[in-house]
Design a protein with these regions (language model features):
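Aromatic-lined carbohydrate-recognition surfaces of secreted/lumenal glycan-active proteins
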Residues: 156-169, 190-206, 224-231, 256-278
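Extracellular glycoside hydrolase catalytic/binding regions
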Residues: 206, 226, 234-252, 257, ...
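Bacterial N-terminal signal peptides that target proteins for export
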Residues: 1-9
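Structural preference for beta-strand elements that scaffold enzyme active sites
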Residues: 47-52, 86-92, 157-161, 223-228, ...
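N-terminal catalytic cores of secreted or lumenal carbohydrate-active enzymes
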Residues: 31-204
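Substrate-binding cleft of secreted/luminal carbohydrate-active enzymes
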Residues: 272-276, 288-399
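Active-site groove signature of glycoside hydrolases
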Residues: 85-99, 161-168, 213-240
Length: 399
């Protein structure tokens, strides 16, 4: 499998642009490079209920997001046998590639002190994974097509958001003596990530490569809505000198956001409660932002304050769970109660129906809940799906 995606990655370099203006590796304004679907947008697309789909790292089981795995995320069949559209957004993301056949590990974000940062080759492999036939985006497009044959046309194309790797300054994140010239070449020149313009150039190259592959796919049932910033903190000069020196988010992200906005694409982000920069998200250029309460793992977190901050900041909510809530797992009753607290607080505070929601479920938690034959798990699954399909925000956004 690794060899397949490595071979596929080579195609990223020479990917032909279909439906887009020729994407040159230059400083041309983003508006001059818009694809047909980007030109036709009146506004940047948003989602009401987006599910996080972690994939790309060899340590994950299952490894692929094929049609069989994606089907329960596309539609929901209720207790009366009625099939309905479920998630309208799919965020494909990864933060590390571990357990690789070559024995190496690469990090796609700052903060990893144990693995070297991914370079251009690993970024290409990640793109190849997302766009492989029968996987991720291609599988989603086909799954939606199959569902439309059963229940009719979806209200909107399912919206895809693809992660944007973090151009880590030093090859080893926390080692300031490690090289900053490790990523690879663009236009015949080795990039140096000590230079902000080179980090931005790498991100633009990745964005354009994803857009090219998406255009070449000819997808009819999904659209590329935007990109997801993988690091859960952003920094400003007032942060500690150490962390700011290693990230410099404030001088890079606004340029990336401006580029994406010129393409009518969004820049999305999911910081955790209390993380650096989460209260200044607009200054970095983010569009759709969700706050992680982390209550599922840290019940000491004050949910009343979390939802107060959501209201004050004008952001959405990330609803969080893992397979640890499945019946028979140690401590599952406590995890179920915490999970239900998210939905309860969302309704009581008015977040439900007014703010977008993202759904974290680990690697395969939602699928495991769907597949469980246990009566308690089935009850919880239906409760969650009713929460999603009944989201009042869908009607307001023509969903």
């Amino acid at each position: 499998m690794y060899g397949f995606f490595k071979t596929m990655a080579l195609a990223v370099v020479a990917a032909a642009t279909v439906g887009c203006a020729t994407v040159k590796r230059s400083a041309a304004p983003a508006g001059e490079k818009r694809c047909a679907w980007e030109k036709g947008r009146r506004e940047r697309p948003v989602t009401t209920d987006a599910v996080l789909c972690y994939g790309g790292s060899h340590h994950r089981t299952p490894f692929l997001w094929d049609g069989k795995r994606l089907a329960p995320y596309v539609t929901y069949t209720d207790e009366e046998g009625r099939e309905q559209w479920l998630f309208d957004g799919f965020i494909f993301l990864e933060f590390v590639d571990a357990s690789r056949p070559d024995g190496r590990t690469y990090a796609f974000e700052t903060g990893n002190r144990n693995a070297p940062a991914a370079g251009k080759e690993q970024w290409q492999e990640l793109i190849a994974y997302f766009f492989a036939e029968g996987n991720c985006i291609d599988a989603l497009d086909k799954s939606v097509a199959e569902a439309e044959r059963r229940i009719g046309r979806a209200p909107t194309r399912r919206r895809v958001v693809v992660m944007l790797p973090d151009p880590v300054i030093h090859r080893m994140y926390a080692d300031t003596t490690a090289t900053t010239v490790y990523w690879g070449e663009l236009d015949g020149r080795k990039l140096d990530f000590s230079r902000n313009e080179d980090r931005i150039a790498a991100c633009k190259w990745y964005i354009d490569s994803v857009r090219e592959r998406f255009a070449a796919g000819g997808y009819e049932h999904v659209e590329l809505a935007g990109f997801y910033w993988i690091r859960e903190i952003v920094t400003r000069p007032q942060d500690t000198e150490y962390s700011y020196h290693l990230t410099r988010s404030d001088i890079m992200l606004p340029h990336i956001a401006e580029y994406l906005h010129g393409l009518n694409c969004s820049l999305d982000w999911i910081p955790y409660y209390g993380s650096r920069g989460y209260d200044a998200w607009r200054s970095f250029g983010f569009d759709q932002v969700y706050l992680q309460p982390n209550y599922y793992w840290k019940p000491q977190n004050d949910m009343d304050d979390v939802f107060r901050r959501i209201g004050e900041l004008g952001v959405g909510l990330e609803l969080e769970f893992e397979p640890t809530l499945l019946a028979g797992r140690k401590g599952s009753e406590a995890f179920r109660e915490r999970f239900r607290a998210y939905m309860r607080h969302a309704k009581e505070t008015g977040v439900y129906g007014s703010r977008p929601i993202a759904y974290y479920h680990g690697t395969n938690g939602f699928y495991d809940l769907w597949a469980s034959p246990d009566a308690e798990d089935r009850e919880l699954f239906h409760e969650l799906c009713r929460f999603i399909v009944g989201n009042p925000l869908r009607g307001e956004r023509a969903e």
